[in-house]
C-alpha cells in the first residue's frame, strides 16, 4: 500500500504555523507499521487543490487530506474534490441533522455558513467526526482513496484512530501483527547511537528507527510477524544494555512522563526551584493529569534576591560562588524541599545564552541539585550551546534523570557522552 498525505492551508504553506498534524500522523502510522511515502503541502487555492488531488491520485493507493473542511470561504477541500472528480456537491442530510443537533445541544443558533460543512462530493462516503462540526469523508479518484480530515488536531486524532486506521487495514488487508518498543535516550546524538546499534545482528522481522525530538532521541524497535514479536522484549533488553545510561525511559514520549508516573505511583512528593529552566520542569509535569497529588510547588527564582528571600540561599554563598554554582543550587534545592517538607526537590541555575557566559562559566554551564531527606546530590554540567531552548530543555532532562535514578535506587550522577561535567 502506498500512503501519501496532502496538507492544506495558506498558513501552513507560509510557515506561519508549524504542521504538527503531519508529524503526528507520520509517527502514528509508523507505529502501525505503515510509512508515508510522500507529503505535499498546498495553499487554499481552488485550482491548486484540484490539480494536486488529480495528480497524486494517479500514484498513491490512499491519501490522507488534512484541512479545509471548515465553514469559511477559504475552506475548499470538498469543492476541490468534487471538481477534481467532475461531480456536484450534494447535501449530506445525516450530517446537516447532526450539525443542527450539536448547536441545539450547546444552546447556540447555527450560522448559515455551517451548512457548507454538510455539502460533500456526490460520490463521497461520510466519515464520522465525533468531536467537531467538520464532516469527514472519503472519495475514490483514479487509483486512490482520498480520506478527508479536519485541521483541528484533536479532531484529526480521533478520526485517524477510530476511522482511518481500521479502514486501511480492511481495505488493503494489512498484517496487524506489528509490535513496537520505544526507548527514550538523552546525552548521545543520533549518529553515536547508530554507531553502537548498527553492528547488532537483529532477528528476522526486527528493525530499528530513530526520531530526534530534542532533548531526546527516541529509538523505535519494530517487530513484524509473530516470531519477531515473541523476541521483541529480549531484543529491547539487549539494546538497553548496549546503550547503558543513555536510555532513560521505555515506551514513554518524554522523560517528564516517566517521572510523572513514577511519582504518581510512589506516593512521594516533589518541589521544584528553577532559575535557568524558568518553570519548564514544573510545566512539563503539570501537563499530566494527577500531578497535583505529588507536585507541591514550583518556584521560578530567577533573581538573586528571590533565591535569598524565597529559598533562603545565604547571600554570602552568592557572593563567594555566584548564582551558577554547586553551592548555590544545593541551597536552592534544600530550601525548596524544606518549605513544604517534600520528599524531593530539584533545583537548576545556569547560563542558557546566547549572552552571559564567561571563560570560567561559558554559555551552557548549568548547576543542578536534587535534595532528598537523606542529603543532596549535585553536579555542574557543560551543555552544547546550540540554542537557548536546547540548554534549558537538556537541563530539565538531566534534572529529571537524577530524580529517576534516585527513585530506582541507582547512581544519581552518571556520564552522558555529549554532556560534560565540571569537577566540584
Swiss-Prot record:
Gene3D superfamilies, sorted: 3.30.70.2860, CinA-like, MoaB/Mog-like domain
NCBIfam families (alphabetical): cinA_nterm (TIGR00200), PncC_domain (TIGR00199)
Pfam families, sorted: CinA, MoCF_biosynth
Protein name: CinA-like protein
PANTHER family reported for this sequence: NICOTINAMIDE-NUCLEOTIDE AMIDOHYDROLASE PNCC, NMN AMIDOHYDROLASE-LIKE PROTEIN YFAY
Lineage: Bacteria, Pseudomonadati, Pseudomonadota, Gammaproteobacteria, Alteromonadales
Protein family: Belongs to the CinA family.
Domain of life: Bacteria
InterPro entries in alphabetical order: CinA, CinA-like_C, CinA_C, Competence-induced_CinA, MoaB/Mog-like_dom_sf, MoaB/Mog_dom
SUPFAM superfamilies: CinA-like (SSF142433), Molybdenum cofactor biosynthesis proteins (SSF53218)
